[in-house]
A protein has these predicted regions:
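Generic short amphipathic/hydrophobic targeting helices enriched at N-termini
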Residues: 2, 12, 22-25, 76
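Kelch-like beta-propeller repeat domains
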Residues: 3, 37-43, 47, 54-365
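Intrinsic disorder/low-complexity segments
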Residues: 6-11, 31, 49, 360
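C-terminal motif of bacterial Sec signal peptides marking the signal peptidase cleavage site
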Residues: 33-35
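N-terminal secretory signal peptides that target proteins for export/translocation
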Residues: 1-17
Length: 365
């Protein structure tokens, strides 16, 4: 399915995450003031068995009202001021679990699930300056719950689900017809991918029957090398890159949501479980704004959440920093400049809205 790459301020090094999406039918703006202090408690519980069906997802009944500020901080602690609100534009139709790429001047929204629970081949181009959305092509292989990364300037889509789990690697770079350029060593869906600028990395997911633990690296989108192994196989994790490492947050392992935080060293390929989320979480997405790593939305059990957490890689701590405009899961995410775009998703049904999360340096804790 949700993203933005290592340097989210550069439109061509977008991190594209798995494809989970959800949005909300509210227009209030949520104001968040964020710092790395006042971490939440950690949980080591395995969590409850999640539902794989949208019909069983429920909106969190205890969510704070949109627009209510949450402030944390301590003297001398740098802070980032976030605002979240619905964008002025919407998608032509509701979609969840798409892959979203940042492009020059906009977004590319690829694949996903429709409100009728069917996989779409649609490719949409969003012009952020003019707030317009237009059809930009069709996938050769329709997929949802795929993953994307930018490799040598090419927008590549890896795997995904449809009538069967796919191994296709599809080049969806604007300016050329979408095409299948190669295949993963094995089919994968519910996976994530990131880029470090020189190469793309494919992590997590499953092949239709068992979880995938091999970490793949590609420098051209055509050949893949195994560079490491995940300590815990997960589907639907959130992913971010920070400090020369890939971080996986939560996800589903053996049909149960997990609290695990996995760190993969990009130099050695070594992976380890280094900490835990405050509670089991899957179907969330992560993004990086002004150097801060944030985990947003997702599901705990069958409940869709609107919570936003900030992650401190140095201390392996999470800080609850506020709420999205509404409960949200299974959305696609990409970062353009200092704004993260949370596209589509489930709330708990598929939606056609886009949420903008903006960051400004400073702010008064």
């Amino acid at each position: 399915m949700s993203v933005a790459p290592v340097d989210p301020s550069t439109a061509h090094r977008h991190q594209v995450l798995r494809l989970l999406n959800a949005a909300c039918a509210v227009t209030a703006v949520g104001l968040l003031t964020v710092s790395c202090s006042t971490p939440t408690g950690s949980s080591t519980s395995a969590g409850s068995s999640p539902s794989s069906s949208r019909a069983h997802a429920a909106t969190a009944p205890g969510s704070a009202a949109p627009g209510s500020p949450t402030q944390t901080g301590a003297a001398g602690t740098p802070s980032v001021r976030l605002t979240s609100a619905l964008a002025a534009f919407t998608l032509p139709a509701a979609v969840s679990r798409p892959t979203v790429f940042a492009t020059v001047g906009g977004l590319l929204v690829v694949g996903g699930l429709t409100a009728a629970d069917s996989t779409t081949s649609s490719i949409l181009r969003v012009d952020l300056a003019h707030t317009t959305v237009r059809q930009a092509g069709q996938l050769p292989v329709p997929v949802h719950d795929a993953a994307g990364a930018v490799v040598k300037g090419r927008d590549l889509l890896f795997g995904g689900g449809s009538t069967a789990v796919s191994s296709a690697v599809q080049d969806v770079t604007p300016g050329a017809s979408p095409r299948v350029i190669s295949h993963l060593p094995q089919p994968r869906a519910d996976l994530v991918a990131v880029s470090d600028g020189a190469a793309g990395y494919v992590l997590g997911g499953f092949n239709g029957s068992t979880g995938s633990t091999t970490i793949l690296r590609t420098r051209d989108g055509r050949t893949f090398a195994t560079v490491g192994t995940l300590p815990v196989s997960v589907r639907y994790p959130a992913v971010a890159v920070s400090g020369g490492a890939v971080w996986l947050f939560g996800g589903e392992h053996a049909g149960r949501q997990t609290t695990d935080v996995q760190r993969i060293d990009l130099t050695t390929g070594r992976g380890s479980v280094v900490g835990h989320l405050p509670h089991p979480l899957a179907h969330a997405s992560a993004f990086t704004l002004r150097g801060g790593v944030f985990v947003a939305g997702g599901r705990t059990g069958a409940t869709v959440t609107d919570a936003v957490l900030r992650f401190d890689p140095a201390r392996i701590r999470f800080t609850a920093v506020g709420h999205l405009p509404g409960a949200l899961s299974d959305f696609g995410v990409a970062v353009v400049g200092s704004t993260a775009y949370l596209v589509g998703g489930e709330s708990p049904k598929p939606v056609n809205t886009v949420i903008q999360v903006r960051a400004q340096a400073g702010g008064t804790p």
